């Protein structure tokens, strides 16, 4: 039976940590664990998901819930409430709902203070890991037979009815998702006709849509590594770009760090033209993936082919000219003397940057894509290297299992992010003493996860921003600082500092708060906006050379309403408690940031949310940031327009329910059937409450509160509904804790600020 292990290293000599592995979450298989009833419950959950997999594509994290239910048994003695259409929402009903929800949600808190959960969703992550482990000969070393079995389960479970696989679990079939998933299943031991016809259906989808030559550029890269696509069918990824002077706008050090850190090892692997061993499976795949014999494929033509199902960001003409020039003239010169000397120097430079990233994230790396690419680059450099051995155990930091199988997550978790939001949600309910132990544990996690040092060496040499005082998205061992994570961590720390330490523990030291404020203010761009990990270092026109057909806005670190709003909120909260610290700088920062938020509001009153679905999320941040900066409904046209927008989207039944298509198409789209979503409803309620909606017309808030109460399950939780996170406009990702955090937060604010106002 599978067991979740939290904050453990297992005595592995190849694991490094800064803080005793706080936040680490790893699933292990114990063949002796589980009694017959537990094993039967797990199998029932798996069958249940498989039976409904085309209707409900998101797991409910039932394996984790079963484990916590056994470890932290809870008998709810508060009756569940369902309100009839004619019934009004009462304070008693809301209080009952909140107590039941927080009591249940608290049982899922790990002993180190964070809330573990599924952060999966993208389907293109696991194939990179499988291919890397296969070509390096480490597949069976890194992944047990049970791991491989659960990965196969996951890949089969998320096959679409047409036979293909999507970019993410709720997406339509794409060549990127289909070809890579099919290949992964073959490498994991599935035959061409396995899976009760599933493999045959998958292969048919691939061939019916032109074959693997139509896969996206990232897919071409992975298939070339494996040996089932020729490197000449790839547009160049020249490592020499790392030798350019930094003042050039196209220098990779000026790019968004996720883009930079993915193309960094890609440069190395492309520069080496590495191809894995040609095994019998590879020869079979060369026959299975193409409409014509492998030796007859037109690789030059294949360079720019992309299936229409995958094409979110079509290449502009300038890109076609650039790739053709590099392919036909520059690359041939780099493969012979004297160009090959320059290539060797470039590859050496790239490898230095790869090692710096690995060492400063304890071999977790910034994300799952560069994690496996860096691991492969280390193996290519030296198959017996210490670096490769240090990479292997960190593979498990990215793997998560639920009733749908084992997936690769979009990060090593969302630990700090979810914990900071949870603290704010529980404090908003006013039930602080009742849930003091929960807050105290969470406080401990927040304190232990703050980044206390900058990365070593000359930061400019490694193109790194300062880190000291920041909070990361997940764990201190990961350590990459992020503006909004720093802001949310700081907000949570400040809230907890106002509560008796007898209840929540000792507050974060003042000097560490000062460090956090210093780091946070360092993120402000000249236009007042805040980007994610770093300042915006180059120009938006660089998006013209975005080679990833599947994603939008990846080349530079753009400023976002979410990051900017979070910074305003944190600085405002800090200023109230420490009014004398850098007062004029903080005031100027808040003023410029608020103007930036007003400047990017859409004409309909909304803000586009870039990190969750979508306009309800962005508009919550827009409103909350402006209110924190001192704007009100009366003095701010932007807030008035935002309220009009949100009220216009409330469903006839009450509540809000926004589809991921809003993110993809950038047009507000309701869920199919105009169903409410608990998380969207929570965001909209929080925005309207902050904007003073209760003083004008509380009825929309009463209706929304009733929706949330009636969505609540018998066990106190809110349901897992459609996927709610997003990145780069087109790929969805799971934020599994949101289902409980935001209904709790919204009902808490509603109870304190709407119902109390009515009295």
From Swiss-Prot:
UniProt catalytic activity: (S)-2,3-epoxysqualene = cycloartenol
Annotated transmembrane regions: none
Residue windows of the PFTB repeats: 148-189, 513-558, 590-630, 639-680
Enzyme class label: isomerase
NCBIfam families, sorted: squalene_cyclas
Keyword terms, alphabetized: Isomerase, Repeat
Catalytic residues as annotated in Swiss-Prot or TrEMBL: 484 (proton donor)
Similarity field: Belongs to the terpene cyclase/mutase family.
EC number: 5.4.99.8
GO biological process: triterpenoid biosynthetic process
Protein name: Cycloartenol synthase
InterPro entries per the UniProt record, alphabetical: SQ_cyclase_C (IPR032696), SQ_cyclase_N (IPR032697), Squalene_cyclase (IPR018333), Terpene_synthase_CS (IPR002365), Terpenoid_cyclase/PrenylTrfase (IPR008930)
Domain of life of the organism encoding this protein: Eukaryota
GO cellular component: lipid droplet
PANTHER family from the UniProt entry: LANOSTEROL SYNTHASE, TERPENE CYCLASE/MUTASE FAMILY MEMBER
Protein function: Converts oxidosqualene ((3S)-2,3-epoxy-2,3-dihydrosqualene) to cycloartenol.
Any GO molecular function: cycloartenol synthase activity
């Amino acid at each position: 039976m599978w067991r979740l292990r939290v904050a453990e290293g297992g005595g592995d000599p190849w694991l490094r940590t800064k803080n005793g592995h706080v936040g680490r979450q790893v699933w292990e298989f114990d063949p002796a664990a589980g009694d017959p009833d537990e094993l039967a419950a797990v199998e029932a959950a798996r069958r249940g998901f498989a039976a409904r997999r085309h209707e409900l594509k998101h797991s409910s994290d039932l394996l984790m819930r079963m484990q916590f239910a056994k470890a932290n048994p809870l008998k709810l003695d508060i009756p569940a409430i369902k309100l009839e259409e004619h019934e009004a929402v009462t304070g008693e009903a809301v209080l009952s709902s909140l107590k039941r929800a927080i009591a249940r949600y608290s049982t899922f808190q790990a002993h180190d203070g964070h809330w573990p959960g599924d952060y999966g969703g993208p389907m293109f992550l696991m194939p990179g890991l499988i291919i890397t482990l296969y070509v390096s000969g480490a597949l069976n070393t890194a992944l047990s037979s049970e791991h491989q079995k659960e990965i196969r389960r996951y890949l089969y479970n998320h096959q679409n009815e047409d036979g293909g696989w999507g970019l993410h679990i709720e997406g339509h079939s794409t060549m990127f998702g289909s070809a890579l998933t099919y290949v992964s299943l073959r490498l994991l031991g599935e035959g061409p006709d396995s899976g009760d016809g599933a493999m045959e259906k998958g292969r048919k989808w691939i061939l019916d849509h032109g074959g693997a030559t139509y896969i996206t550029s990232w897919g071409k890269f992975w298939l070339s590594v494996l040996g089932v696509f020729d490197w000449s069918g790839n547009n160049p990824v020249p490592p020499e770009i790392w030798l350019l002077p930094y003042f050039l706008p196209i220098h990779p050090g000026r790019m968004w760090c996720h883009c930079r850190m993915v193309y960094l090892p890609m440069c190395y692997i492309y520069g080496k033209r590495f191809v894995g061993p040609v095994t019998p499976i590879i020869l079979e795949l060369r026959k299975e993936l193409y409409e014509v014999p492998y030796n007859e494929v037109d690789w030059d033509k294949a360079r720019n082919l992309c299936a229409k199902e995958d094409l979110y960001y079509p290449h502009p003409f300038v890109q076609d000219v650039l790739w053709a020039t590099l392919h036909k003239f520059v690359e041939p010169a780099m493969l012979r003397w004297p160009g090959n000397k320059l290539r060797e120097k470039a590859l050496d430079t790239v490898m230095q940057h790869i090692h710096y990233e690995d060492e400063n994230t304890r071999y977790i790396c910034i994300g799952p894509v560069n994690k496996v690419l860096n691991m492969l680059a280390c193996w290519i450099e030296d198959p017996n290297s210490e670096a490769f051995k240090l990479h292997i155990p960190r593979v498990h930091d990215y793997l998560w299992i639920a009733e749908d199988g084992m997936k690769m997550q979009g990060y090593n978790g969302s630990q700090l992010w979810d914990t900071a939001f949870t603290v704010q949600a529980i404090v908003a309910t006013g039930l602080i003493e009742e849930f003091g132990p929960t807050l105290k544990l969470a406080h401990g996690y927040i304190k232990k996860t703050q980044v206390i040092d900058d990365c070593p060496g000359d930061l400019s040499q490694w193109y790194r921003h300062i880190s000291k005082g920041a909070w990361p998205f997940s764990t201190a061992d990961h350590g990459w600082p992020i503006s909004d994570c720093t802001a949310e961590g700081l907000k949570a720390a400040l809230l907890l500092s106002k509560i008796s330490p007898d209840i929540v523990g000792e507050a974060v030291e003042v000097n560490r708060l000062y460090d956090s404020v210093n780091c946070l203010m360092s993120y402000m761009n000249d236009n007042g906006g805040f980007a994610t990990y770093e300042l915006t270092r180059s120009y938006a026109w660089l998006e013209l050379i975005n080679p990833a057909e599947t994603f939008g806005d990846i080349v530079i670190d753009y400023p976002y309403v979410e990051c900017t709003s979070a910074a305003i909120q944190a600085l405002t909260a800090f200023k109230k408690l420490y009014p004398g610290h850098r007062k004029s700088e903080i005031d100027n920062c808040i003023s410029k940031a608020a103007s930036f938020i007003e400047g990017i509001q859409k004409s309909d009153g909304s803000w586009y949310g870039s990190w969750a679905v979508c306009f309800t999320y962005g508009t919550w941040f827009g409103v909350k940031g402006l209110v924190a900066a001192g704007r009100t409904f009366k003095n701010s046209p932007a807030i008035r327009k935002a309220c009009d927008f949100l009220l216009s989207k409330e469903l006839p039944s009450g509540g809000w329910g926004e589809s991921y298509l809003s993110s993809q198409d950038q047009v507000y789209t309701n869920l199919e059937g105009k169903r409410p979503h608990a998380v969207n409803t929570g965001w909209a309620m929080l925005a309207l409450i902050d904007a003073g909606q209760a003083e004008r017309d509380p009825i929309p808030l009463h209706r929304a509160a009733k929706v949330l109460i009636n969505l609540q399950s018998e066990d106190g939780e809110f349901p897992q509904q459609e996927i709610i996170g997003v990145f780069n406009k087109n790929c969805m990702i799971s934020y599994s804790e949101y289902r409980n955090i935001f209904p709790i937060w919204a009902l808490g604010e509603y109870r304190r600020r709407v119902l109390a106002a009515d009295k």
